[in-house]
Amino acid sequence: MDLNADFTKRVVVHAGDVPWIASPMPGVDRRMLDRIGDEVARATSIVRYAPGSAFSAHTHTGGEEFLVLEGVFQDEHGDYPAGTYVRNPPTTSHTPGAAEGCTIFVKLWQFDLEDRTQFRLDVEAQLGPVQDGIARAELHRDAREVVSYVVLEPGAALTELAPGGIEVLVLEGTLREGADDLVRWSWLRLPEGTPLQATAGSAGARLWMKTGHLPFAQAPLV
């Protein structure tokens, strides 16, 4: 299955308007944003766990990163409340679930296969000082990509010139980019060479952002 798999094109998905699609596990549904592959896939999705649902134990052959959007995500290693960013590199494993239900933004098979750095962060706790109406937290950096949490005050202008492409998920508030008004859970992907030039709405905006990574996009090596 290929979905938004041409990484040379600009893509906007208003995920709040996308229907949920049932996963193979009962009680776990997905909104797919981009995908190369079937059940083993390089994938970007929003995933919803119903209360009491769980996924079977599995190993992250290609790595997994996620941000908890709502509720509390759980596995045998602990609880991950909303606002937690997690990187589970290749070879890690767990049995995920959510006793009270949760929603996460998750990316699969998008790691350097030699990466072994595993961590979790409270994104709010990482924020730096406000400059020109914008506060930033760098969540992860390596030779392939930079992952950030960005908070914009009302009307703040955000410009990113990062090579290698840009990807943004709006977590709260609104963001104007080109002719599009991005709202909560709107997802934007800009191809390599296209700058991000956006302005926060009247309530400001909170964003998850990744830059530099699109040249490495490929189907899982299985």
Residue positions per predicted region:
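The feature marks the first
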Residues: 28-32, 36-74
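A short, N-terminal "cap"/entry segment at the start of jelly-roll beta-barrel domains
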Residues: 1-39, 99-144, 148, 222
